[in-house]
Amino acid sequence: MVVIYLNSTGNTYWIPIYSLNDKIREPYIFYVFAIFQTSIYILTGYILVRICWIFLTIKVFHDNMNIMMCWFLCQWFQAFLAKIVLIPYQFGIIKISMDINKTYYDWWSDTVEKSAILREDVNIWPIYFASYFLWHYMYSILFAVLAVGLERVCATWYIQDYEHVSRRHIPILLIAATNLITLPYAYQTTNNRTPLLQTCLQSIFIGSVAVFGYIMLWRVNLAWRNRIVNLKFTHNEKYSLARKFQIEENIKSLILARKLVVSASVFILVVTILLAVLLFDPHGYDAFFVHALDNSMLLPALVMSLTLLSCSPAWKERFISGLPIIRRLKSSSVAHQNSYSTASSAGKETEAYFEQLRSSWA
């Protein structure tokens, strides 16, 4: 992420792009990156819309959990619009720095010398608001894991009647609380008031709390399921189908969470490798690694949605059957079967007619 410095006020801003005034638009490689980036964005948008619709129509989990998953996944479109605003600055189509011929590749800097110094006549607001909303998206994805985990805590707490009572206030309050945390975080980060080390430590802490919470929920729900299987209840507990169903749903959601953690860990490992390679200054290939790292910011939603899709056979089947190419193949196959059955029935009717004709002449 490039840090830019405003001369007139002395303020610094942390912009969530890995390059500024990039000259990659001059050679043909720019068109390769542009086509690849556009294809990824179109594919991600299509998959997210389809998956959110599937979540709301095929209710594998409770409505509250489905609503929260759709909300956090659809925030990708917020990040997409912010990224569209930032791209002209990134590729030097709109120049804002004092040295318009210099290309800035940086992760973070706490010195003015390594920052991009802005011209006095620059309108900072478009790049500022776009950066703010992109930071907000990244923090929202981080806190989404914690928020969905808290929804499962509520499901465990109200285990006797959670399936029968909607309790729409739970996802509303959790989404509102998440934004009350992420909006100030995004403001502090955009204004470069949060050091890089502090940002990393906070992210690690939040992830650790979420993982610990999921482990505890897993153990509690497994213990309850074992009690139901063994019919061992305490004096203030009672068996009910709603309780059994909710325990099974909690366990399914925790298995889903485990798959999300594994896929997110692999994704973070790949991004870390890209960052490590970039820090070693690969001469001649720096543009490739910079843009690979830059595009990785909008990929978590795609990784999460594909992982969620693979967790339910019903979701996966609906998604695959709804693909345009699959629909065409199915429609042509149905038409072929209908024509074949029509021809077959017509042939049988003809044979029956001639058989009756022969018998009448016999």
Curated annotation (Swiss-Prot):
Transmembrane segments: 29-49, 67-87, 127-147, 170-190, 204-224, 260-280, 288-308
Keyword Transmembrane: yes
Major localization class: membrane
InterPro entries from the UniProt entry: 7TM_GPCR_serpentine_rcpt_Sre
Mode of membrane association: Multi-pass membrane protein
Cellular component GO terms, alphabetical: membrane
Official protein name in the record: Serpentine receptor class epsilon-37
